[in-house]
Regions:
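Intrinsically disordered, low-complexity
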Residues: 102, 106-109, 113-116, 129-248, ...
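Short, conserved helix/loop micro-motifs enriched in His/Cys and acidic residues
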Residues: 205-220, 265-268, 272-287
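Acidic helix-start/capping segments at beta-turn-to-alpha-helix junctions
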Residues: 249-262
Length: 337
């Protein structure tokens, strides 16, 4: 009687255990399927590629456990496989959150650059005759962008992937709107300020910080943008070899105010402020014979200046809009036109 009872209890107990193993196997199968989906969706969306490799290995491990006979699983169980798979899944999910946060941070950084340019142009166009509506549109775009940026800052602490992705996308959209509004304002200013097609309004014109300018060594009251000075020095050295004297520099970088005082709307000689390459530190006016077409000095410069990154622009050529033999520019001056 005792033996019979024991058998019955063992049988019942064993049945319960078998049921538990089946349920546990279902859990592992479900978990594995979810992990496989995560492996697929996480492609290109993690910061640590090794987490996906780890997940892939744990999925293979889980699959091999699931392929084992029920009897084997009865003795070994699936607990280890489930725990390892869960840890690998967590690692991928954490890496995906990090990746999504990185996208938001990147979007915020690129927003900052667009914002800086927009604000510079907004300020530079104040009181310059541009339609107020065009400026108001940029201001509105900047306000909307600032709000999105503040919201994104809060979202950064979220672990919700969809929310993070939405924040990054929204920042990108806002940046585009600000960029378009900035270009519209810049074009509007250009249209009313720079009458000639070879001129381009630039918010930096006449406002180059002194740290970005460099003194011309043989003409110390004159400055050009620091990055174009080495070419000018080399050009001068070659010129000196040919003519025994330095290039005569009569004009170089001009501040916004000095360009404004030179500008005479009834004469094409000086460009309106904001439209001159002198204001960018990329132009010099040269004398010592160069101020006349077809002199030896002018001809020499025409033949040699480009070797050193300097050129005589089309508008100043004989027959150009303003024939100015003396006006020379860095080749960089026309890069943006
Ligand atoms: Zn000039």
């Amino acid at each position: 009687m005792i033996i019979v009872t024991l058998v019955v209890v063992l049988a019942m107990g064993g049945g319960g255990f078998a049921w538990f193993v089946v349920a546990e196997t279902d859990d592992l199968a479900t978990q594995t399927a979810a992990a496989e989906e995560l492996l697929a969706t996480s492609e290109g969306k993690v910061t640590e590629q090794s987490t996906r490799a780890g997940l892939s290995a744990q999925i293979a491990e889980a699959r091999s456990v699931l392929d084992e006979s029920v009897l084997t699983r009865l003795t070994t169980g699936t607990g280890d496989a489930r725990e390892s798979l869960e840890a690998a899944t967590d690692a991928v999910e954490a890496s995906m959150v990090e990746f999504a946060r990185g996208r938001v941070t990147e979007a915020r950084d690129s927003l900052a650059a667009a914002q800086a340019r927009a604000e510079k142009i907004y300020q530079a166009t104040e009181g310059q005759g541009v339609d107020d509506a065009v400026r108001a549109r940029l201001q509105a775009a900047l306000d909307t962008m600032a709000a999105a940026d503040t919201a994104a800052d809060t979202t950064l602490s979220s672990e919700d992937l969809a929310e993070l992705a939405r924040a990054a996308d929204e920042l990108g959209t806002n940046r585009s709107v600000v960029t378009v509004a900035t270009e519209a304002l810049s074009d509007a200013q250009d249209a009313i300020t720079c009458p000639a097609p070879d001129q381009a309004w630039d918010p930096d014109s006449g406002k180059v910080p002194s740290s970005a300018l460099a003194e011309i060594p043989w003409a110390p009251t004159h400055f050009v943008r620091a990055d174009v000075l080495p070419g000018l020095i080399e050009l001068d050295a070659a010129y000196r070899e040919a003519f025994g004297e330095h290039l005569t520099i009569n004009s170089s970088y001009r501040t916004y105010e000095s360009q404004a005082s030179l500008y005479d709307p009834s004469s094409p000689i000086a460009a309106p402020p904001g439209c001159s390459n002198h204001g960018l530190g990329l132009a010099v006016d040269i004398g010592g014979g160069v101020e006349t077409f077809d002199t030896e000095q002018y001809t020499w410069l025409k033949q040699n200046a480009e070797t050193y990154g300097w050129t005589h622009p089309d508008f100043a050529e004989p027959g150009g809009r303003v024939p100015e033999p003396w006006h020379w520019e860095s080749v960089l001056a026309r890069a943006g036109l």
